[in-house]
Amino acid sequence: MLTKEITLCGKVVTLAYCYATEIAYKDLSDENIADYIKDAVACIQKETDPDVKHTIYAIIACMLAYYQSRGEDAPLTDTDLMNEAKPAELGTAIFTIIGLRMDFYHVPKGEPKDATTIPDASPSGTEDKGKN
């Protein structure tokens, strides 16, 4: 089980990703978490807010996966998240869930390209070496 601690509503909570997370999300929302994550990424790229209800479902699913596997109650409820979570905390949670899911499915992370591999864009087709 992959886990990560984040702060939500002033409490440090552990989010986990495993098959139980996907099942819990499906039970809460009657949708596939992969679809939510795709929508959340699209919202973030357009700098709009993803559906808060589905963000809360995803957070609760990740908390339940961790705390119930340990026989413990989750430290936050959906009501706590709706009423007390700051937008930045919800954003952090979305990125955390995306990262955990990528790690769970072994999705390779892109490597930044070295500056030397960037094609020359000068009009003459020659490199500008900074000479006058």
Q: How would you describe each model-predicted region?
A:
Residues 1-12, 32-47, 57, 69-132:
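Charged interaction scaffolds used for protein-protein
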Residues 62, 66-70:
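Amphipathic alpha-helical interaction segments
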Residues 19-38:
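Short, surface-exposed, low-complexity cationic segments
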Residues 29, 47, 51-52:
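Short, solvent-exposed helix-helix connector turns and helix-capping sites enriched
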Residues 53-61:
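Elongated alpha-helical scaffolds
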Residues 15-17:
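Short capping micro-motif at the N-terminus of alpha-helices
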